[in-house]
Structure formats: C-alpha cells, structure tokens
Amino acid sequence: MTNIRKSHPLFKIINDSLVDLPAPSNISSWWNFGSLLGICLGIQILTGLFLAMHYTSDTATAFQSVTHICRDVNYGWTLRYLHANGASMFFICLFLHVGRGLYYGSYIYTETWNVGILLLFAVMATAFMGYVLPWGQMSFWGATVITNLLSAIPYIGTNLVEWIWGGFSVDKATLTRFFAFHFLLPFIISALVVVHLLFLHETGSNNPTGIPSDMDMIPFHPYYTIKDMLGALTMILALLVLVLFSPDLLGDPDNYIPANPLNTPPHIKPEWYFLFAYAILRSIPNKLGGVLALVLSILILALMPLLHTSKQRSMMFRPLSQCLFWLLVADLLTLTWIGGQPVEHPFIIIGQLASILYFSLILILMPLVSIVENHLLKW
C-alpha cells in the first residue's frame, strides 16, 4: 500500500514542498530566513486578527480602542506588542533574506526574485498602513507626509492624493480604508508567498558556492526541518525578550500622544525599517526627484540580474565584491541612522553622500569590480 503522504492529492503537495523536497546539502543558516518569514507572517496574521476584534477604525475612538486593548482585554498588551514588534522581526528577517540573495547570487532565479520584490513592496505597504491605525501623532503626520508625496506626480498628483485620502486631509475616511487594506494585504502576501515558493521549487534552492548542487541533494526532512526549528526558536525567543522587556524600544514616544492636526511633531519620521529609504528621499531637494529616488531605492533590486557581470554566481570566492557588499551594508546602516536625525548640518550632507554611494555601489562599482575579478582569474 502506498504511503498516504505520497498518494493523497493534498498531502502530496505538502510532502513535495516540505518533506521529500531535494535540498542542497551545504546550505547555511542564511537559508533559514524564508521559513522565519513564514512564521512572522503567521504571527502577524494571528495577532492582527485578535487585535481587529477589539479595534475601531474611527478617528474619535481609534486611539482609545488601542488603549482599551492594552488595559482591559485579556493579554491585549501582549497581542499589541507582539504585533508591533513582530513587524520589526519581519523586516529584520526580510532585510537579511534579501541580503543573502544579493551575496550568494540568488537573483539569477529571476522569477522567484521578482515575486520577492513584489512581496517586499506589499509588506512595506502593509506596515505603513498599520502604523497609521493607532492614530497617534506620528501615525497621523506620517500618513500625511508619505501620502502627500504622491502629489509630486505630474498632472494627476493632487487628485490622486485627495482620492486616497477620501477628502481634503487625512481623516476618518483615510483611517477606515487604511484599516480595510491593512487587513486585506496579508492575505494577498500569503498568496504571493505561494507563488514565490512555486517558482523556487521549479529551480531548487541556490547554495553558498553558487555551483549547481544537483549531484548532492538531501531530503528536506528531517535535516532542514530541525534546522528551521532551531532558527524559529531563536527568533521567537528574541521577539519575546523584546516584547516582555522593552516593548517600546523600536517605537516612537510621539505615538502615545493622540493625533492632533493642529500640532506638528518636531520631527516626523517613519518606523526604523523605513528610515534608509526616508533618508534617500530627504537627501534630494526636489520633491519629484526625491519620490523617484525613494521608489528606485527598492526597485533597483529588479536590476540585479541585469547588473550581474561576474562569471561566478556567488560572492563566496570574490573578495573584492565582498568588500563592496559590506560597504553597501554599512552605507544602509548609515542611511538608517541619518533618516532618524533632524534635517540640519552635518546630517544633510552625510545623507546625500550616503545616497550617492548607495546608487553608485549597485549601479556602477559592483558590476565593474566583477569584471575586474573575471580578468584577475583569467576568465
């Protein structure tokens, strides 16, 4: 008799994706982040669902409903902080996952990579709208500033912004639609995740060497299931430490002040995971130019397969490219720091230099250094 896991139509799909899936024998812990992102998504959907049961998307009661969740709902504070800090864990895993893809040349699988970029945009949109929901000062002003950027689009800009707002300012209509989209998007993300995995399983996983591993595969279970469980345990432990010891570490104190359209906070800034893009936006004095740079700072990832000039796939054996990669990481950390600083000297010039370096590294320096490495290896 055939094993039900291999004969049942539904179990067969799960078996081929999680149990009998052939995986390279040498993939390191950098390959753990896919499963960690799946766990993050699960945590966010579950905690979000329970929060939505108590939240009201009305400007008069939104702030109060979040206070009610924290004070009166059983373990409501846990749900709220798990959800808020879960988003931070989500982005930490996302950035590491994308960084792994850049370092080891995973972008050569263009379909998987492009769906991944779509996922990144979808998660960023979801996080932005979620930040607006508590209706604190930073929620309101963050929503006003970021949506207002669309007015830089020629001809249709102003109409587009008012259409998104549902009026002439960020108000009740905006909050209600943001809540609706914030609830809907994670399910769209889940569908995109399935497509992402579908494309990945067409080609199989890449590995640290970048050399095809068809001749040396091992079953996913038990080897990588146990490895993923260790990663999951580590991440959940880190999340719980954050939630139970310093839940407001990554938040903004201004968001504990109810939204007030008549009082602008001294420094409007988004959550930490958007600061690098925010710094790039602010470093260009022109509004439309800033918006284009903001979008391109993420969309530039789509050019990675075209900018790959090396004869080797991975950076594992390319020390010059490795140096530039870590320079890029340092540059992104610098941009993140600058995004959280006020717009004054010397932060303005540091931000502008870091932005120039960011685009130069990806578009010019890394492809050139790859060509140099090819010649050094006489390829």
Curated annotation (Swiss-Prot):
SUPFAM superfamilies per record: a domain/subunit of cytochrome bc1 complex (Ubiquinol-cytochrome c reductase), Transmembrane di-heme cytochromes
Gene Ontology biological process: mitochondrial electron transport, ubiquinol to cytochrome c
Binding site for heme b b566: H97, H196
Membrane spanning residue stretches: 33-53, 77-98, 113-133, 178-198, 226-246, 288-308, 320-340, 347-367
Main subcellular localisation: mitochondrion
Topology in membrane: Multi-pass membrane protein
Binding site for a ubiquinone: H201
Subunit structure: The cytochrome bc1 complex contains 11 subunits: 3 respiratory subunits (MT-CYB, CYC1 and UQCRFS1), 2 core proteins (UQCRC1 and UQCRC2) and 6 low-molecular weight proteins (UQCRH/QCR6, UQCRB/QCR7, UQCRQ/QCR8, UQCR10/QCR9, UQCR11/QCR10 and a cleavage product of UQCRFS1). This cytochrome bc1 complex then forms a dimer.
Annotated protein name in UniProt: Cytochrome b
Organism: Dobsonia minor
